[in-house]
Amino acid sequence: MKKVTAMLFSMAVGLNAVSMAAKAKASEEQETDVLLIGGGIMSATLGTYLRELEPEWSMTMLERLEGVAQESSNGWNNAGTGHSALMELNYTPQNADGSISIEKAVAINEAFQISRQFWAHQVERGVLRTPRSFINTVPHMSFVWGEDNVNFLRARYAALQQSSLFRGMRYSEDHAQIKEWAPLVMEGRDPQQKVAATRTEIGTDVNYGEITRQLIASLQKKSNFSLQLSSEVRALKRNDDNTWTVTVADLKNGTAQNIRAKFVFIGAGGAALKLLQESGIPEAKDYAGFPVGGQFLVSENPDVVNHHLAKVYGKASVGAPPMSVPHIDTRVLDGKRVVLFGPFATFSTKFLKNGSLWDLMSSTTTSNVMPMMHVGLDNFDLVKYLVSQVMLSEEDRFEALKEYYPQAKKEDWRLWQAGQRVQIIKRDADKGGVLRLGTEVVSDQQGTIAALLGASPGASTAAPIMLDLLEKVFGDRVSSPQWQATLKAIVPSYGRKLNGDVAATERELQYTSEVLGLKYDKPQAADSTPKPQLKPQPVQKEVADIAL
């Protein structure tokens, strides 16, 4: 019966798309150089790059909702972290010999420096206005307890001192010092508990929804840019000249139109996979998606909010995905401070918060069903974790909060459903299928269509991700003197690494901090810490990571 239902649903969707395409033929076809599908931060960032690189190119942006930045880019639908690996312990895994690997942390931090430079440049151009409306200084802290975790944090701190990107980080195992940094976390805690923390003053809280709205508002000032809201893509067809005809339904009046585009970017968040499949390019057959949602506890009580100014990340429990690490965060949303704690994983078959319960089923094909099954069979610990999260009670969530805020009161907190994160599942020759953390740009060989899949680190690295897309799709243009000069004006460090160059790191941090109104003091000498005891780690099955 389920197979029959699925078949009928697929037929209905297919017939509807054919009908839409037929109706659209009757109307005049719109032409555009660049079609941006999705009104989130990725499309907004790519459009902003292209506006500077090729100001004469026409652009059309499509958004199925009634406003932009309503899904994962919305400030309430994500944690608002400027991910730079200052506190996120999952970016510094422990090796078998007990040493700490910092390569991933360095890469994440380098990427965020590109985002800071991109935003600073847009502020100088007047594209982004009032930096405090979208980015604020909020110190980033790691906080752990227990002897093994304290030893891990010692080793992590020592390892990160090798990088110029992490200079200025502080370390302490002293209760009084940590209480000064994060009083809410320490008050009411057992004074005999062994704890440790790191703190970096230059951490940030970012409202990605506000950035998105401001970027798009600036794009709209040009006559060769068009934003179409309540517009849903129903079909994509490659033409003989390698342009694309995209059939778009107006969700308000039921009409349809065809848009002919030279280049199509699918930046539709969770919906990107289905649209990539609709394009029919062979590269899409390697991918599947699995949706995971997230919930946060939220407090707007001034007694709580005014007592906490930090993002405090802990360490994931044994057997849990590294990215599932709980954190208690200062956020600045809609002009006021709030505190969030989470995330707690949730499950829905929707690929978007405003999506359809059919999303997961309709994206499952004969080419990706086996990789999905392999991932499920190979990652039973992950499945068990997700089930345990879905089964959490109100009391369970509150007890988790008290590990980070011992004196928390239930009446100060409410539960908030954040956005959906579609995890990448990719075909693998050896394993059949693997779960991939991170984002991935998928494009055709001709460079006429590209999609962004994945969820983490996501919005905080929109600027470097879109740089990667430009290099992948417009390689010849990127190598031209004109584009090189423009890209280096937008991102001064473009084409080189900051890590290892103390002077360059300080110069870029000083520049972006001044323009964005962020706190920055030149780093002082590193804190002296007990020498970490590097212990060989027991061999354990690696738990696949997911983004919440």
Swiss-Prot record:
Location of the region described as Disordered in the Swiss-Prot/TrEMBL record: 521-548
Catalytic reaction equation(s): (S)-malate + a quinone = a quinol + oxaloacetate
Stated name of the protein: Probable malate:quinone oxidoreductase
Enzyme class: oxidoreductase
Keywords: FAD, Flavoprotein, Oxidoreductase, Tricarboxylic acid cycle
Pathway: Carbohydrate metabolism; tricarboxylic acid cycle; oxaloacetate from (S)-malate (quinone route): step 1/1
Cofactor: FAD
Family assignment from sequence similarity: Belongs to the MQO family.
Superkingdom of this protein's organism: Bacteria
GO terms assigned for molecular function: 2-hydroxyglutarate dehydrogenase activity; L-malate dehydrogenase (quinone) activity
EC number: 1.1.5.4
UniProt cross-references to PANTHER family, sorted A to Z: L-2-HYDROXYGLUTARATE DEHYDROGENASE, MITOCHONDRIAL (PTHR43104:SF2)
Gene: mqo
